[in-house]
Amino acid sequence: MEKNVCKMTDDSIFLIDIEKILKTKAGKKYKYIPRFVVSYLKHIVHQDELNVFLKDSKNKVGVDFLEACMEFLDAKVEIKGLENLPENGKCTFVSNHPLGGQDGVALGYILGKHYNGNVRYLVNDLLMNLHGLAPLCIPINKTGSQSRDFPKMVEAGFASDNHIIMFPAGLCSRRQGGEIKDLEWKKTFVTKSIETHRDVVPLHFEGRNSDFFYNLANICKALGIKFNIAMLYLADEMLKNRHKTFTLTIGKPIPWQTFDKTKTPAQWAQFVKDVVYKL
């Protein structure tokens, strides 16, 4: 992958600014937000620490940026089934999403390095603000101004010559019935892999967040709170998981022809999810 020689100044890079976000979202009501709330939000998103990293890595993009993320998190990954990575053709890589941080970074780094940067994530468009990550991202947003373009953006991603990395659950794993597993996998990766003749490679990433995170998510669900409050704590969870070694298991590719009419696309998505959790 080519190195980006463009030098960026601190003023031109995205930095986390909780006060600016709250002022934008709350408008005139911002003045009624207690200062301790603002301070707490800065604390749980680790604003100062992450901004130091973003400044230090401002001239790194793509796989180089992901490598810097791995070093910052002191994350190590033991890989099983490396021989299952296809050398020919375009593939869709699908994985469980236990962490919301290290798993995404590690998959992009490992696959990006193996395929010389020819990988793309389908991600929430908010991540496009990260200059270093943006070249590897296909922004998707099912709500707001981009909702009309959502199918078009997904289409463009799968029609490209890059391998696609997806977390079909959309959200990171939750505790369900005492077991930490992904929520329902969406069928998009099945339908688009069929259309573009991409084999599907199942991946399983071993890891978990704290009990606090899972309990909070379940409490919010029980109370009917639609806003994903647990998401605010993902940066905190990511840093709690520093200095750890994770295990990535790569399964054998599933030929796209497998996804025939004997099951619906949603059923095939569940089938692949089951394959992942058996790895």
Curated annotation (Swiss-Prot):
Pathway: Lipid metabolism. It catalyses: a lyso-glycine lipid + a fatty acyl-[ACP] = a glycine lipid + holo-[ACP]; N-[(3R)-3-hydroxyhexadecanoyl]-glycine + hexadecanoyl-[ACP] = N-[(3R)-3-(hexadecanoyloxy)hexadecanoyl]-glycine + holo-[ACP]. Pfam families: Acyltransf_2. SUPFAM superfamilies: Glycerol-3-phosphate (1)-acyltransferase (SSF69593). The keyword Transferase applies. Keywords: Acyltransferase, Lipid biosynthesis, Lipid metabolism, Transferase. GO terms for molecular function: acyltransferase activity. It is an enzyme of class 2 (transferase). GO terms for biological process: lipid metabolic process. Its EC number is 2.3.1.-. InterPro entries: ACT14924-like_Acyltransf_dom. Belongs to the O-acyltransferase GlsA family. This is Lyso-glycine lipid O-acyltransferase. It comes from Phocaeicola vulgatus (strain ATCC 8482 / DSM 1447 / JCM 5826 / CCUG 4940 / NBRC 14291 / NCTC 11154) (Bacteroides vulgatus). The lineage of its organism: Bacteria, Pseudomonadati, Bacteroidota, Bacteroidia, Bacteroidales.
